[in-house]
């Protein structure tokens, strides 16, 4: 009973602090837009934000988190103007829920999944592992990090990959889960997991952390494509900065930044 009460109190505190944070940024300022961004895209959105703000007088406020949590927060009334999801399903669901503008959804990036095996390199050459080598190394790893498949599309892709390889049940007891792909990266980089699955863009964004490690560029046919969609929320229907950023995301300048970060588009 005590455990239940403590869990309930913790949940209430989390909701309280989230509410306080959103209350501070929720003012209807026509010169700013609040963008909810999936964790894998945080580093890239920072580059896009700088470029966008040099071209427009308005300001972007970035709120990061797992796709599942951001979706839940929007449903609970969080004042987010644009949702940059790591999947297609949740933006579509927001439209079905009547919270997003019909026809505003589009794919802004297609993610790539890689297997990361720290300290396993015998020389230079990232992404040099074969599928067979990766499977053998995974089987010899005591802890393998994946993002939560229920909250993070990269976690779902990782689970699907292991199922395709026939390894999910075998490795199940050794799997540790991060809430999002950022926490998964931290589990591996800190040594709390010997191997795991991250986004290609994370490896490119943190060369100092992964410079001597080995990778397998996952075969994209072994999991559902990680198509990442954006959608405009109804609260921002007349927000000029939100409208401008949605248009900017489709521009050649933005797409070049997104490609350089390790995404397809």
Question: Model-predicted segments: where are they?
Answer:
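N-terminal secretory signal peptides that target proteins for export/translocation
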Residues: 1-6
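Composition-driven detection of intrinsically disordered, low-complexity segments
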Residues: 8-10, 92
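Bacterial N-terminal signal peptides
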Residues: 11-22
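Exported/periplasmic ABC-transporter solute-binding proteins
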Residues: 24-64, 68, 72-78, 87-88, ...
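Short active-site segment of divalent metal-dependent hydrolases/proteases
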Residues: 84
């Amino acid at each position: 009973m005590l455990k239940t009460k403590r869990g309930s109190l913790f949940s209430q505190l989390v909701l309280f602090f989230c509410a306080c944070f959103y209350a501070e940024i929720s003012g209807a300022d026509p010169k700013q837009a609040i963008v909810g961004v999936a964790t894998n895209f945080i580093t890239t959105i920072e580059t896009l934000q700088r470029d966008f703000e040099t071209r427009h007088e308005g300001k972007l406020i970035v709120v990061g988190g797992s796709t599942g949590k951001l979706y839940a927060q929007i449903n609970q009334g969080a004042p987010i103007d644009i949702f940059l999801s790591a999947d297609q399903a949740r933006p579509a669901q927001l439209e079905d829920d009547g919270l997003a503008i019909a026809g505003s959804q589009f794919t802004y990036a297609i993610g790539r999944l890689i297997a990361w095996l720290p300290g396993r390199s015998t020389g230079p050459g990232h992404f040099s592992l074969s599928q067979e080598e990766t499977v053998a190394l995974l089987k010899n790893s005591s802890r393998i990090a994946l993002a939560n498949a229920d909250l993070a599309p990269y976690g779902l892709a990782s689970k699907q990959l292991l199922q395709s390889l026939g390894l999910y049940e075998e490795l199940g007891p050794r799997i540790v889960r991060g809430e999002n792909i950022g926490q998964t990266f931290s589990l591996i980089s800190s040594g709390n997991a010997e191997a795991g699955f991250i986004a290609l863009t994370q490896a490119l964004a943190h060369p100092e952390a992964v410079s001597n490690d080995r990778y397998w560029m996952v075969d994209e046919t072994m999991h559902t494509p990680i198509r990442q969609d954006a959608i405009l929320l109804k609260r921002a229907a007349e927000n000029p900065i939100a409208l401008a950023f949605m248009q900017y995301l489709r521009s050649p300048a933005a797409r070049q930044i997104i490609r350089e970060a390790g995404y397809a588009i």
